[in-house]
């Protein structure tokens, strides 16, 4: 082996002569066929596996390599590390030896034991020419070594700029940047950008960014920003921020780059990096001052006092989007919270912007103007929406470094970087705070949050269809430049960009297919995607976009045809592509996504964005239509009064669908519809009637509009109307209505409840309610135009089971003055709060309406288990003052004290009659004119009715015919009743089981009592009264339930007689019931606790509360009949609470009440026979009474079980 070692030593020492001699001996030995001389092994390898060719390649001697190759040395011989001579030649970076080896057919992609090919070594050590030659000889730059690094990775890791440029210019650049040969799940996975950032190679990073590498690509350690921050590479951090890296991305250890700097570094460089990251992060940290949660809002952020919240963005409705990171649990929570519950704990250093509100009042969405930055203000009005990435332009001011901790330096907004999604890996959106105190218009295609524009009621804006507003529609300045709206996109865009010296980007916008309206909705990500990569330019263009004022251009209706929709968007050229792809209807187009657009062939970014904006508008309109249908939105629209569009609450995180203001409380919760209506209407503006809906659409669910609404007072709701009905009681839309009407907020849909307040109608206009009466809950009818013929306010009950004719009726007044008053009826009422009564009662006047609250919802009748009974007060307390002799009423009864909730409690105010035209068949829930002149009234309430919420109640009432043309002689007030019916019996505690029925029958049946004695106010009746109840119609009540009539009459008089007020005092007033009828002005209805009232000359009856037991009053539906209604005499009132121990006495009173009801029916029969109607009405009345007795007996049985 001596000669082989000599050869290796000679090659190693570069002794060409010695090598030549040894090689020559090898040649001579080959020529000799026989000889004792042993042949020289040219491929001999030492202990390390090195051969002579290895040493020659490593030394770079061309002569030695050539000699060895001539001597048949193996060109791809491997050493102990698997390295070949080409590896060493490439490592040395000498071009000619590499060329020589390559000509000798060296393997260019042969890998060593650690997986490296010669190109790895050439790239790692920056040998540009060698790398270029290897690439020319088909070396594969995508091969990875055992550390999962490509030649580009090594070049970037070691800062080999020229080699990196060479590799980036190769045809496999995209594969290198994407890392196709790498597994992202590998723990050693890395990218060239990470390696360059870790080692601080700024120029290499610039080349990588220029080549289009994903700046936010993440590895186990995070993004490249994490690496640069951890290793203290300040300039690299600044460069990455300029490139638009997302500073809020967390690594697998749930750390941001700023967290890493705070935890692991303390150098001067780290302090600078902290400064840069704080400026770039867009972070405003606040601390919660108190607990806040909203279980009904899935988008709400539930916080506890002391929680530190990172503010991400500002929602247009005034709420802030925050993020809470719980380090102990390793969880993150993102949601919206009102800014009034937090205080600022850290402020970003940067450009001073608007201060945070110090008062606990959230930002309201009623700002109808977009903030316009000053000419020298470097802070752009970045729109909310997709959370832009942060970048800092080198030529843009970085803010005042001395303003750390100052109140105004809340931070600066950075422009966005690449067009990739800024969604964090933890599933929560990250981004920056929109720090202006005013909501900014959405420029993101992802935002479906209309309603930024909130006109005040005085704006008198015309009504627009649902979801007709788009964010930021009305701005403070006119369109700039003017031709933006004229479709000359190229010239308009060029002129616009020329205003801030960036006209060089005109081609970028045009090539991407953007026109001016779509530019107005661009985000910083969109700007990056079209090639605006310079952060300073991107920031400037974004700020100018935010100042654009472009009128609404998206169609605010759902077109029938796809082509029509595309033409409205200005993209009819895609009709064929959409149809051929199967999107041939509007329903299918509404579900388009970005990915599907690319598959279809819509490749221009501007066209994609415009189509997606149109798709979002379709979704908004569809949601708006569904919302309108759910609330009974009809087609009829009124033109009176101001129009408001209400935004829907963020129920599931989606933006609602209707535009307009949302009036908020100090914690950002929505005000009730009534307060919105009152605040929007200024307290005096009459609101128009909303369109009606059918009873099948009326349900409790229509009232359940999200959180916090269960105790709200509803907005007035008119009854179902059909303008085409021949005998409607509605004025045409264009005619003036005789009284002011109520309306819910436009766009919100009609509220499912009606509250019309009967009242006195003097010749002078009715004054408004005093401050004690809540305006939002009480609407007054207007005074009549002609004093002699005051119109009556329209009212109707809420029928739960409505006949067909009622479907076609319209709400409103009859044409011309209507004189006959409506008969009162029984209805569900609820007890108002004591505070409401105390506020209302002392200042009530005869012309004041009553505060109203919601009753039960309309619903189709259905059978079911009884709902839970309402809570009741044990009794009624209150007093009434007798009405004055001139017909005006005193203060209302029952308004000064608590009262029990009532079901059937009519009020007895009267109105002076006026001429009225006969009407056709009306709904059984509407009161027809009657000669007694008793207007309708509704009970009202201040608390929830559980059984009303269940929607199981059913009122069965018969249609009542209209009376004859009224006479000019009015009558004193009389009482008539329509009692509601329930298909279930509400149970009460045993000691009070019979009290509800007894008090209900007191209201109904005492009108006919003929018990003798001076204490009976009914003993003096009109001469035309029919015979006594001895000749009553067939009665099917069980004797076991109803005691004898005499006993019941006497007990009834003892219970119902008011002590100290003898009955005959009511005689003079009652004697006029059918004789001369003096003019009596209308008495206003009682306050929410509507009590029965007997007007008389010398009586002061006590209030009676009618309990919540439903009575059946059901009978055949009648055709309209002529003739005056009988005048039921007034009844005395109960003096005080009813003791629970008088159960037997209540049963007796029940009997007398039934007897009185029969007498009232007989009086009605007598009156009708005398006035000329046929006997059919008599038969129907008796049938009604009989049917009512049947249901009443069943209920009595059930109650006594």
From Swiss-Prot:
The modification Phosphoserine is found at residues 358, 371, 393, 396, 403, 406, 409, 471, 724, 855, 874-875. InterPro entries: ANKS1/Caskin (IPR033635), Ankyrin_rpt (IPR002110), Ankyrin_rpt-contain_sf (IPR036770), Caskin1-CID (IPR032232), Caskin1/2_SAM_1 (IPR035497), Caskin1/2_SAM_2 (IPR035498), Caskin2_SH3 (IPR035499), Caskin_C (IPR032117). Residues 904-921, 935-944, 1042-1069 have a biased composition (Low complexity). Residues 281-347 form the SH3 domain. Residues 415-425, 837-856, 1012-1038 have a biased composition (Polar residues). GO terms for cellular component: cytoplasm. ANK repeats lie at residues 48-77, 81-110, 114-143, 147-176, 188-217, 220-249. The keyword Cytoplasm applies. Residues 764-773, 961-973, 1123-1132 have a biased composition (Pro residues). The modification Phosphothreonine is found at residue 880. It is found in: Cytoplasm. Keywords: ANK repeat, Cytoplasm, Phosphoprotein, Repeat, SH3 domain. The modification Phosphotyrosine is found at residue 253. Residues 730-739, 1160-1172 have a biased composition (Basic and acidic residues). May not bind CASK. PANTHER family: ANKYRIN REPEAT AND STERILE ALPHA MOTIF DOMAIN-CONTAINING PROTEIN 1, CASKIN-2. This is Caskin-2.
């Amino acid at each position: 082996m001596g000669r082989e070692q000599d050869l290796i030593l000679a090659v190693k020492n570069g002794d060409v002569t010695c090598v030549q001699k040894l090689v020559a001996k090898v040649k001579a030995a080959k020529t000799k066929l026989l000889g004792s001389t042993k042949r020289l092994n040219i491929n001999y390898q030492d202990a390390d596996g090195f051969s002579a060719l290895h040493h020659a390649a490593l030394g770079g001697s061309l002569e030695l390599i050539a000699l060895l190759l001539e001597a048949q040395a193996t060109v791809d011989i491997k050493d102990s590390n698997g390295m070949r001579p080409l590896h060493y030649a490439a490592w040395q970076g000498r071009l000619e030896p590499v060329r020589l080896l390559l000509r000798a057919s060296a393997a260019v992609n042969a890998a060593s034991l650690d997986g490296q090919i010669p190109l790895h070594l050439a790239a790692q050590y920056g040998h540009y020419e060698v790398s270029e030659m290897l690439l020319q000889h088909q070396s594969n730059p995508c091969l990875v070594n055992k550390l999962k690094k490509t030649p580009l990775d090594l070049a970037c890791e070691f800062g080999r700029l020229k080699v990196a440029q060479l590799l980036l210019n190769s045809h496999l650049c995209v594969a290198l940047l994407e890392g196709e040969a790498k597994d992202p799940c590998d723990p050693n996975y890395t990218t060239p950008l990470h390696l360059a950032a870790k080692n601080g190679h700024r120029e290499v990073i610039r080349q990588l960014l220029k080549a289009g590498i994903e700046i936010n690509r993440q590895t186990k350690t995070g993004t490249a920003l994490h690496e640069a921050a951890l290793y203290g590479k300040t300039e690299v951090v600044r460069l990455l921020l300029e490139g638009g890296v997302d500073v809020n991305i967390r690594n697998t250890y749930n750390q941001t780059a700023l967290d890493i700097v705070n935890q692991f570094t303390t150098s001067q460089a780290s302090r600078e990096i902290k400064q840069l990251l704080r400026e770039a992060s867009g972070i405003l940290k606040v601390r919660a001052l108190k607990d806040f949660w909203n279980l009904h809002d899935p988008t709400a952020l539930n916080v506890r006092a002391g929680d530190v919240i990172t503010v991400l963005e500002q929602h247009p409705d005034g709420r802030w989007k925050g993020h809470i990171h719980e380090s102990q649990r390793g969880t993150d929570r993102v949601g919206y919270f009102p800014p009034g519950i937090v205080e600022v704990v850290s402020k970003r250093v940067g450009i001073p912007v608007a201060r945070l509100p110090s008062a606990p009042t959230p930002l309201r969405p009623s700002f109808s103007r977009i903030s316009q930055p000053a000419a020298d203000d470097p802070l752009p009005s970045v729109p909310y929406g997709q959370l832009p990435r942060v970048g800092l332009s080198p030529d843009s001011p970085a803010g005042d470094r001395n303003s750390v901790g100052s109140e105004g330096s809340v931070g600066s907004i950075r422009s966005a970087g690449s067009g990739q999604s800024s969604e964090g890996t933890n599933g929560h959106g990250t981004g920056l705070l929109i720090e202006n105190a005013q909501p900014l218009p959405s420029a993101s295609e992802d935002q479906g949050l209309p309603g930024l524009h909130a006109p005040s009621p005085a704006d008198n804006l015309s009504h627009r269809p649902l979801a007709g507003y788009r964010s930021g529609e009305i701005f403070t300045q006119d369109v700039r430049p003017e031709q933006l709206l004229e479709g000359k996109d190229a010239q308009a865009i060029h002129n616009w960009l020329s205003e801030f010296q960036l006209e060089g980007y005109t081609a970028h916008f045009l090539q991407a297919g953007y026109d001016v309206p779509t530019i107005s909705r661009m985000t910083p990500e969109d700007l990056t995607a079209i090639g605006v990569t310079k952060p300073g330019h991107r920031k400037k263009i974004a700020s100018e976009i935010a100042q654009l004022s472009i009128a609404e251009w998206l169609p605010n209706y759902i077109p029938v045809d796809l082509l029509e929709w595309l033409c409205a968007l200005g993209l009819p050229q895609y009709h064929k592509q959409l149809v051929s792809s199967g999107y041939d209807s509007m329903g299918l187009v509404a579900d388009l996504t970005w990915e599907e657009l690319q598959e279809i062939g819509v490749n221009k970014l501007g066209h994609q964005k415009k189509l997606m904006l149109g798709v979002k508008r379709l979704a908004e309109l569809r949601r708006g239509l569904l919302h309108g249908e759910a609330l009974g939105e009809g087609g009829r629209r009124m033109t009176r009064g101001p129009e408001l569009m209400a935004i829907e609450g963020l129920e599931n995180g989606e933006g609602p669908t209707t535009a307009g203001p949302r009036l908020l409380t100090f914690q950002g919760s929505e005000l009730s519809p009534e307060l919105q209506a009152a605040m929007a209407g200024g307290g005096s503006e009459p609101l128009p009637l909303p369109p009606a809906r059918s009873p099948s659409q009326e349900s409790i669910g229509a009232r359940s509009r999200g959180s916090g609404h269960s105790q709200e007072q509803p907005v007035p709701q008119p009854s179902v109307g059909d303008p085409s009905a021949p005998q409607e009681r509605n004025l045409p839309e264009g005619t003036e209505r005789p009284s002011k009407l109520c309306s819910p907020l436009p766009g919100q849909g009609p509220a499912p409840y009606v509250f019309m307040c009967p009242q006195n109608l003097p010749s002078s206009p009715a004054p408004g309610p005093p401050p004690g009466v809540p305006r939002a809950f009480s609407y007054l009818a207007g005074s009549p135009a002609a004093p002699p013929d005051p119109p009556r306010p329209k009212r109707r009950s809420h029928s739960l089971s409505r006949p067909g004719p009622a479907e076609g009726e319209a709400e409103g007044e009859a044409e011309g003055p209507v004189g006959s008053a409506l008969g009162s009826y029984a209805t569900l009422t609820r007890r108002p709060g004591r505070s409401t009564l105390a506020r209302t009662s002392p200042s009530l006047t005869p012309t004041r309406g009553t505060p109203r609250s919601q009753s039960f919802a309309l619903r189709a009748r259905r059978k079911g288990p009884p709902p839970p009974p309402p809570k009741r007060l044990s009794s009624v307390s209150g007093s009434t003052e007798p009405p004055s002799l001139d017909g005006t009423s005193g203060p209302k009864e029952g308004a000064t004290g608590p009262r029990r909730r009532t079901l059937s409690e009519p009020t007895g105010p009267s109105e002076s009659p006026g001429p009225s035209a006969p009407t056709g068949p009306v709904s059984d829930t509407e009161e027809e004119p009657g000669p007694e002149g008793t207007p309708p009234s509704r009970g009202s309430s201040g608390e929830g009715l559980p059984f009303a919420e269940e929607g199981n109640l059913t009122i069965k009432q018969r249609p009542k015919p209209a009376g004859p043309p009224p006479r000019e002689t009015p009558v004193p007030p009389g009482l008539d009743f329509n009692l509601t019916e329930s298909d279930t019996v509400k149970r009460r505690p045993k000691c009070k089981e019979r009290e509800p029925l007894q008090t209900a029958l007191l209201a109904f049946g005492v009108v006919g009592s003929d018990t003798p004695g001076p204490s009976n106010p009914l003993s003096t009746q009109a001469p035309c009264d029919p015979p006594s109840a001895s000749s009553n119609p067939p009665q099917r009540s069980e004797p076991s339930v109803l005691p004898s009539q005499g006993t019941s009459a006497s007990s009834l008089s003892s219970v119902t007689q008011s002590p100290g007020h003898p009955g005959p005092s009511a005689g003079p007033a009652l004697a006029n019931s059918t004789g001369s009828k003096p003019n009596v002005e209308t008495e206003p209805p009682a306050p929410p606790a509507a009590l029965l009232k007997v007007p008389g000359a010398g009586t002061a009856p006590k209030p009676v509360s009618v309990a919540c037991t439903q009575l059946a009053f059901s009978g055949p539906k009648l055709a309209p009949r002529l003739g005056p209604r009988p005048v039921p005499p007034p009844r005395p009132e109960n003096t005080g609470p009813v003791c629970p121990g008088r159960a037997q006495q209540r049963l007796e009173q029940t009997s007398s009440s039934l007897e009185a009801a029969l007498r009232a029916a007989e009086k009605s029969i007598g009156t009708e026979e005398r006035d000329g109607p046929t006997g059919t009405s008599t038969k129907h009345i008796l049938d009604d009474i009989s049917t009512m007795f049947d249901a009443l007996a069943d209920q009595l049985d059930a109650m006594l079980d």
